[in-house]
C-alpha cells in the first residue's frame, strides 16, 4: 500500500509530513503539487522527515506527499558511459532538451535511453544454469568498453529463453530464467539497484596490485592499489580568481573594481555561503565583455564570487599591464599555426618571463548614452553623448580647466579655439570669447550651468592632472564617438604621450583606446603615469608556428604572410581584437587576501588595469587519463558551476592514451554543483559509487574520483542542523566519521558474483578542500583515519614550479608493502629496497637543509654536501614531471625503476668517490649529470639503462685522476 500524507512543515531542503503510516526508511516520495523528488530519512510514528532533492521554495504545508514504494535507486545498463548526470542520476543533456539551461522542478527523465537500440551478443544458451552475476550477453557500448549483461544478484535458475544476436532496446526482454521454485524471471539489459546498499560479491581480495598512474612520485613513493582508497587535498584558497582591485568593464557601472562590483551585487539573487567562500546567482545578470568567436563582445555575467587565497601571482608585461591572480587562475597564450589561431590556457603559476599572453586590443560594441538634462538651467544639453559632444570633451580634457562658473581652453591655434567655440554654441547654446593670456591664447566661456553639466560628466574642476577620469558614458559609447574624443584629445598626432598623476585615469584611457583598437603602453615616472600611444611597432607582434618554425612577426608583416598561407580570417578578425603581450616579470606574493570572480557564458572576461583576457574558473584529469583503470567515474560534488563547467568541457577533449579515442567513452560524469539543493549533493556520492560497483561486477578496474568530499560533508552538516541533531566538532554531525567510512569502505578489489572467476576493483580517490589548507579540520582528520594513501599537495612546491606538487615528506601510502610483491615479480625485485633508499635520502636532505639555513652549506662535511647534491637530482630529475611533455607526461613502471637505478648508482659512486678523496666539485662537473637530467624525456629504456655504464666509466676516470 502506497503511503499518502500531507506536509506540515518546510525548512529548506527538509520537509516534514504526517499521515505517512506504512512508509519505509529511505523510501522515495513525491513532494507537493509539483511532485518534487524526496527521500525519507527519519520516521517518527506516522510522521516522516524527508530530504528533498529539488528546490522547495513555494512548497506549503497542506500539499500532498505520495510514496513510491521504492528506495532511491539507479538504473544500471547500456548508456551509462559518456553520460552526464546530476546527483540523483537525472540525465542533464536530456533535461536540457526538455526545459532549457535550468532544471525545472518536478521534471523527470529516464536515466538510460529507452528508444536507443543496442547490439546484443548472447554469451549463454537455453538450458544453461545461471546465478546472480553470470554474464549472459555483451553489448559493445563504446569503442573502448564492452558492456557485460549480467544476471541481477538474487536470481538463479535455468535459462529457458534467450534473445538471438541483434539490436534491442533496454526495455525488451532478452532472457527468461526459470527459478528452482518454478517462477519465470524476465531479464532485460538493465537493472535497478538502491544506492545506499553496496552490491554483493563473493570475496574481498587484499589490495596487492598497484593502480599504475604513470606519475613517478605516486607509483614509486606513494602507490595507490587497485581497490584502494586515497585522499588528495583540493586547491587551497578559492581557485581561479583575481585580486579585488582588478578593474572590470561593465555596461551597468562602467569601469569598476571587481571588489566594488561584488559589493554592489552581493545578495541581489540567490546567495550561498560555505566557509570562507560566498557567491550570488544574480537575479538580473549584468553585461561585461569577453572573447567570443574571434572578437571582444558584450557577454552576460550570471554569478559574482568572493573567497580567500593563501597567495597570489603578480605578472607584469612589456606594455605596462599588471595582473594579480591566484596561482591556478588561467591566462591565455597562443600562436598561429597552419590550422589558424590556437589559444591555450596556462595557469598563472606556470607563466614565466618571455612568455606572450593574449591581451585585448579592440573592444567591439557600445551604444549612444542618454544624458541627464534635468536641472541644467538656461542652457540646452544634447539628448545623447554624440560625436560633437565627444569632440568638445576631448579638447576640454586635453587643454582646458573648469573654474567657478568659467571654462577656459588653452591653445595657440586660434582656428582650433574657434572650432571649440562653434561646438559650444551648437551643443549648449553658449559661446565664449578668445582672449590673450600671459602664457598663450584661450577660449573663455562664462556659464555656471555649463560648468555643472561638465562636472556631472566627470570633468574635474580642479587638480585635473590628479583627478583626470574618462567619463563612464564615453567608455560605453560606440567607436565613432570614442574616435571623435580621442582625435580631439591628441590633436591628430600619430604619437603622443599623455602624462597623468591619476593612476585610475591612466588605466581608463587604455580601455578607451581599446574601443578603437589602439593599444597603449603605460609606465610610471616618479609620481606620474605616462600613457604612450604609438604607431604599430615591436610590441604588436604575432607568435607564428608554421612548418615547424616558430617565429614572432610584426602585425603588418603577418598580414602579408597570412595571405600567402590562407589565414586572412585570423589576421583581419582575431588579431584585430587581441595582441600578444610579452611577460617581463612574475612574482609570488605569499600573503592571504580576499579574491573575487565573475561567471560568464564564455568563461573569460575583460579586466585588469589595462584590458586583459582573464579566465573565470585542481583537476584529477591526469589520474583519469593515465591510470590503468578501465572505467572512470567522476563526481563533481558541490563544486562551483564554473569549475564544473571546466570539467564538462575538458573531459570530452581528453584522449584515451591507450586507444586514441575520447576519454568520455570510458567515463561517467556526475555533476552536482553548489547551487543545486544540498540533499542531491549528499546523494551524488552514493549514486557514483553504485555505478562504479556495477562496472566492477563486470570484471573491470574502476577509478572513482569524488571532488570534493568536504562539500559533501558540508551538505551533511546542513541537513543535520535542520534535523536539530546534536552537533559534533565544528558543527558537523557526530556520525561524520561513520558516514565517511561507509563510503570509502565500498572501495575494494573483489571476486565478483557469478559462476566464473572474475576479479574487479573500485579505487576511490577523494578530494578534500580544507578551508585555508587546514589539515586539522574534522573532514580531513576523519578521512585520514579511513584512507590508506594521502597525497599532500604543497603550495610551496607549486610556487617553485615543482609538479606534481606532492610533498614527499608529509604524504604517505600504507600500500607499499602490499604492492611490493607485484613490483618484484613483474618489474624489478629490488623495487622496495630502492624506494626506501631514495626516501631515506630525501628525508636526510630535509634534516640537512635545517642545518644549512643556520650555518650555510660550506660548513657541512663533503659527505653531507654530496647527499644534498644527489637528493637535488632525485627531486629535479625524478620527482619533477612535465605533464605537458608527450614523453614525460606518462612514465611506465619499467622506466621508473630504471631511472631510479641510474640515480642510486650515481649516489653509490658519489659516496665511494668522497671516501676515496675525490672533491665534490669534480663530481658535480661530470658530463653524465646532464644526461641524467634529460633521461625523463627519453622513451628508450635501454638508452636510460646505458647511463649506468657511463656513470661508472666517468667515475673510474676520476679515481685514476686523483689516484684513488
From Swiss-Prot:
This protein undergoes a protein self splicing that involves a post-translational excision of the VDE intervening region (intein) followed by peptide ligation. Its EC number is 7.1.2.2, 3.1.-.-. It comes from the Archaea. NCBIfam families: intein_Cterm (TIGR01443), intein_Nterm (TIGR01445), PRK04192.1 (NF003220). Residues 392-518 form the DOD-type homing endonuclease domain. Has multiple subunits with at least A(3), B(3), C, D, E, F, H, I and proteolipid K(x). This is A-type ATP synthase subunit A. Component of the A-type ATP synthase that produces ATP from ADP in the presence of a proton gradient across the membrane. The A chain is the catalytic subunit. It is a peripheral membrane protein.
Amino acid at each position: 500500500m502506497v503511503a499518502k500524507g500531507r506536509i506540515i512543515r518546510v525548512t529548506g531542503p527538509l520537509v516534514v509530513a504526517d499521515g505517512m503510516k506504512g512508509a519505509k526508511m529511505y523510501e522515495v516520495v513525491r513532494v507537493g503539487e509539483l511532485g518534487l523528488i524526496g527521500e525519507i530519512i527519519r520516521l517518527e510514528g506516522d510522521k516522516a522527515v524527508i530530504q528533498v532533492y529539488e528546490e522547495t521554495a513555494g512548497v506549503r504545508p497542506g500539499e500532498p506527499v505520495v510514496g513510491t514504494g521504492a528506495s532511491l535507486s539507479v538504473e544500471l545498463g547500456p548508456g551509462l558511459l559518456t553520460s552526464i548526470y546530476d546527483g540523483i542520476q537525472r540525465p542533464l543533456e536530456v533535461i536540457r532538451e526538455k526545459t532549457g539551461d535550468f532544471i525545472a522542478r518536478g521534471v523527470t527523465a529516464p536515466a538510460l535511453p529507452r528508444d536507443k537500440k543496442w547490439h546484443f551478443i548472447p554469451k549463454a544458451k537455453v538450458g544453461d544454469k545461471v546465478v546472480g552475476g553470470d554474464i549472459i550477453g555483451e553489448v559493445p557500448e563504446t569503442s573502448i568498453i564492452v558492456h557485460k549483461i549480467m544476471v541481477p544478484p538474487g536470481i538463479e535458475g535455468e535459462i529457458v529463453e534467450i534473445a538471438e544476436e541483434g539490436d534491442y532496446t533496454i526495455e525488451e526482454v532478452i532472457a527468461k530464467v526459470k527459478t528452482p521454485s518454478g517462477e519465470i524471471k524476465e531479464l532485460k539489459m538493465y537493472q535497478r539497484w538502491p544506492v545506499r546498499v553496496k552490491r554483493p560479491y563473493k570475496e574481498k581480495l587484499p589490495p596487492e596490485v598497484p593502480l599504475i598512474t604513470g606519475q613517478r612520485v605516486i607509483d614509486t613513493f606513494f602507490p595507490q592499489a587497485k581497490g584502494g582508497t586515497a585522499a588528495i587535498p583540493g586547491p587551497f584558497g578559492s581557485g581561479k580568481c583575481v585580486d579585488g582591485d582588478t578593474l572590470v568593464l561593465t555596461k551597468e557601472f562602467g569601469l569598476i573594481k571587481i571588489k566594488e562590483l561584488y559589493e554592489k551585487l552581493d545578495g541581489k539573487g540567490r546567495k550561498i555561503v560555505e566557509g570562507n567562500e560566498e557567491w550570488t546567482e544574480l537575479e538580473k545578470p549584468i553585461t561585461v565583455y569577453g572573447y567570443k568567436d574571434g572578437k571582444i563582445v558584450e557577454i552576460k555575467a550570471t554569478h559574482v564570487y568572493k573567497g580567500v587565497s593563501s597567495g597570489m601571482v603578480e605578472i607584469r608585461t612589456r606594455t605596462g599591464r599588471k595582473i594579480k591572480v591566484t596561482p591556478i587562475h588561467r591566462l591565455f597564450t597562443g600562436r598561429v599555426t597552419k590550422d589558424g589561431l590556437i589559444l591555450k590556457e596556462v595557469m598563472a603559476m606556470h607563466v614565466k618571463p618571455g612568455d606572450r599572453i593574449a591581451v585585448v586590443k579592440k573592444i567591439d560594441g557600445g551604444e549612444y548614452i542618454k544624458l541627464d538634462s534635468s536641472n541644467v538651467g538656461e542652457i540646452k544639453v544634447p539628448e545623447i553623448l554624440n560625436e560633437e559632444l565627444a569632440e568638445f570633451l576631448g579638447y576640454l580634457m586635453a587643454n582646458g580647466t573648469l573654474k567657478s562658473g568659467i571654462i577656459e581652453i588653452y591653445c595657440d591655434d586660434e582656428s582650433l579655439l574657434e572650432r571649440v567655440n562653434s561646438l559650444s554654441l551648437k551643443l549648449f547654446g553658449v559661446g565664449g570669447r578668445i582672449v590673450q593670456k600671459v602664457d598663450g591664447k584661450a577660449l573663455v566661456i562664462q556659464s555656471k550651468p555649463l560648468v555643472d553639466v561638465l562636472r556631472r560628466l566627470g570633468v574635474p574642476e580642479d587638480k585635473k592632472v590628479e583627478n583626470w577620469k574618462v567619463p563612464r558614458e564615453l567608455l560605453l559609447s560606440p567607436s565613432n564617438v570614442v574616435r571623435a574624443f580621442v582625435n580631439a584629445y591628441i590633436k591628430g598626432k600619430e604619437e603622443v604621450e599623455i602624462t597623468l598623476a591619476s593612476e585610475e585615469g591612466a588605466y581608463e584611457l587604455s580601455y578607451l583606446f581599446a574601443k578603437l583598437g589602439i593599444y597603449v603602453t603605460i609606465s610610471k615616472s616618479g609620481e606620474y603615469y605616462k600613457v604612450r600611444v604609438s604607431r604599430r611597432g615591436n610590441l604588436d607582434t604575432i607568435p607564428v608556428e608554421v612548418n615547424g618554425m616558430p617565429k614572432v612577426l610584426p602585425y603588418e608583416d603577418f598580414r602579408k604572410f597570412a595571405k600567402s598561407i590562407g589565414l586572412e580570417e585570423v589576421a583581419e578578425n582575431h588579431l584585430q581584437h587581441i595582441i600578444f603581450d610579452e611577460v617581463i616579470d612574475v612574482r609570488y606574493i605569499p600573503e592571504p587576501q580576499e579574491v573575487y570572480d565573475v561567471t560568464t557564458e564564455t568563461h573569460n572576461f575583460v579586466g585588469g588595469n589595462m584590458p586583459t583576457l582573464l579566465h573565470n574558473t585542481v583537476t584529477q584529469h591526469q589520474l583519469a587519463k593515465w591510470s590503468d583503470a578501465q572505467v572512470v567515474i567522476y563526481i563533481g560534488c558541490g563544486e562551483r558551476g564554473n569549475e564544473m563547467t571546466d570539467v564538462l568541457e575538458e573531459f570530452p577533449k581528453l584522449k584515451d592514451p591507450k586507444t586514441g579515442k575520447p576519454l568520455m567513452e570510458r567515463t561517467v560524469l556526475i555533476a552536482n554543483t553548489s547551487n543545486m539543493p544540498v540533499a542531491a549533493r549528499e546523494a551524488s556520492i552514493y549514486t557514483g559509487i553504485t555505478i562504479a560497483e556495477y562496472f566492477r561486477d563486470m570484471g573491470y578496474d574502476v577509478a572513482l574520483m569524488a571532488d570534493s568530499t568536504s562539500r559533501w560533508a558540508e551538505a551533511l552538516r546542513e541537513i543535520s542542523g535542520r534535523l536539530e541533531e546534536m552537533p559534533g566538532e565544528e558543527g558537523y554531525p557526530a556520525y561524520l566519521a561513520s558516514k565517511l567510512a561507509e563510503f570509502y569502505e565500498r572501495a575494494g578489489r573483489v571476486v565478483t558474483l557469478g559462476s566464473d572467476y572474475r576479479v574487479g576493483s573500485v579505487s576511490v580517490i577523494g578530494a578534500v578542500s580544507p578551508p585555508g589548507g587546514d589539515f586539522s579540520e574534522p573532514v580531513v582528520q576523519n578521512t585520514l583515519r579511513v584512507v590508506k594513501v594521502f597525497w599532500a599537495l604543497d603550495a610551496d612546491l607549486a610556487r617553485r614550479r615543482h609538479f606534481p606538487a606532492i610533498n614527499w615528506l608529509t604524504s604517505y601510502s600504507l600500500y607499499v608493502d602490499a604492492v611490493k610483491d607485484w613490483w618484484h615479480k613483474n618489474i624489478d625485485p629490488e623495487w622496495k629496497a630502492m624506494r626506501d633508499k631514495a626516501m631515506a635520502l630525501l628525508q636526510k636532505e630535509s634534516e640537512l637543509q635545517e642545518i644549512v639555513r643556520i650555518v650555510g652549506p660550506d660548513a657541512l662535511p663533503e659527505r653531507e654536501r654530496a647527499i644534498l647534491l644527489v637528493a637535488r637530482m632525485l627531486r629535479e630529475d625524478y620527482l619533477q614531471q612535465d605533464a605537458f611533455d608527450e614523453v614525460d607526461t606518462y612514465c611506465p613502471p619499467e622506466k621508473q625503476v630504471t631511472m631510479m637505478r641510474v640515480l642510486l648508482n650515481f649516489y653509490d659512486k658519489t659516496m665511494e668517490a668522497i671516501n676515496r678523496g675525490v672533491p665534490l666539485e669534480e663530481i658535480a662537473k661530470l658530463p653524465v649529470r646532464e644526461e641524467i637530467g634529460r633521461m625523463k624525456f627519453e622513451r628508450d629504456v635501454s638508452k636510460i639503462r646505458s647511463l649506468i655504464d657511463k656513470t661508472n666509466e666517468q667515475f673510474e676516470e676520476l679515481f685514476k685522476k686523483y689516484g684513488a
